[in-house]
From Swiss-Prot:
Gene Ontology molecular-function annotations: ATP binding; UMP kinase activity
EC nos: 2.7.4.22
BP GO terms, sorted: 'de novo' CTP biosynthetic process; UDP biosynthetic process
Regulation: Inhibited by UTP.
Pfam families named in the record: AA_kinase
Matching PANTHER family: URIDYLATE KINASE, URIDYLATE KINASE PUMPKIN, CHLOROPLASTIC
GO annotation, cellular component aspect: cytosol
CDD domains the record matches: AAK_UMPK-PyrH-Ec
Function: Catalyzes the reversible phosphorylation of UMP to UDP.
Subcellular location: Cytoplasm
Name recorded for this polypeptide: Uridylate kinase
Underlying gene: pyrH
Reaction(s) this enzyme catalyzes, per UniProt: UMP + ATP = UDP + ADP
Length: 238
């Protein structure tokens, strides 16, 4: 049996990924397929942590641009990530996976508070840990939360699951001649503003030498190929 390239990963899922082709909310078929992909790598012995966004329900930055106080909007966005985390946990339960949700905002009747030691123990026990509510602070994105939790969990790599199969020189939806990077440095991604992640998240990963892989969650078995070290998506490293 081939050994996975990574022992412990952090998967960053955007809220938009849960929508599928819908305009809002959570598409059941999509979330079940994502869970099936996570189950496959978990069964390979890979320890999986997940940071989930909330843009399918509420986007703080957009609302602040429309006149809402930015901090208030960001807290609402954090609550949206808790809703997504619960939906993901429920789908995992139905698929026979054992998971735990830890939130950076305390909602004790619904989810556990974030406690680093417990999260690491859950991972070591083979449970999937879903991190909700970002960093718990406004003005920080869930991408930054993914970088932060990745470092705290001592993961081997952060995997950013998107709708695009990697990082391109320009937007491939606009420019059909855009070329996909196979490998990319953090410095280049930051300097050229390639929209891989926000600059704070990229800088954290760069400074801690934590590699990042960007791939499409909508490509069948792409997550497994990434975990096995096969050529898939774009690798961003120091």
């Amino acid at each position: 049996m081939t050994i996975p390239a990574y022992k412990r990963i952090l998967l960053k899922l955007s809220g938009e990924a849960l929508m599928g082709d819908d305009s809002y909310g959570i598409n059941r078929d999509v979330i079940e397929r994502i869970v099936a992909e996570i189950a496959e790598v978990n069964q390979l012995g890979v320890e999986v942590a997940v940071v989930i966004g909330g843009g399918n329900i509420f986007r703080g930055m957009t609302s602040s641009a429309e006149g809402m106080d930015r901090a208030t909007a960001d807290y609402m966005g954090m609550l949206a990530t808790v809703m997504n985390a619960l939906a993901l946990q429920d789908a995992m339960r139905r698929a026979g996976l054992v998971s735990r949700v830890q939130s950076a905002l305390r909602i004790d009747q619904v989810v556990e508070p974030y406690i680093r030691g417990k999260a690491i123990r859950y991972l070591e026990e083979g449970k999937i840990v879903i991190f909700a509510a970002g960093t718990g602070n406004p003005f920080f994105t869930t991408d930054t939360a993914a970088a932060l939790r990745g470092m705290e969990m001592n993961v081997d790599i952060v995997l950013k699951a998107t709708k695009v199969d990697g990082v391109y020189t320009t937007d491939p939806k606009i420019n059909p001649d855009a070329e996909r990077y196979q490998r990319l440095s953090f410095d280049t991604a930051i300097a050229e503003n390639l929209k891989v992640m926000d600059a704070t998240a990229l800088t954290l990963c760069r400074d801690q030498k934590l590699p990042l892989k960007v791939f499409s969650i909508f490509k069948a078995e792409a997550l497994r190929r990434v975990v096995m070290g096969e050529e898939e998506g774009t690798l961003v490293e120091v």
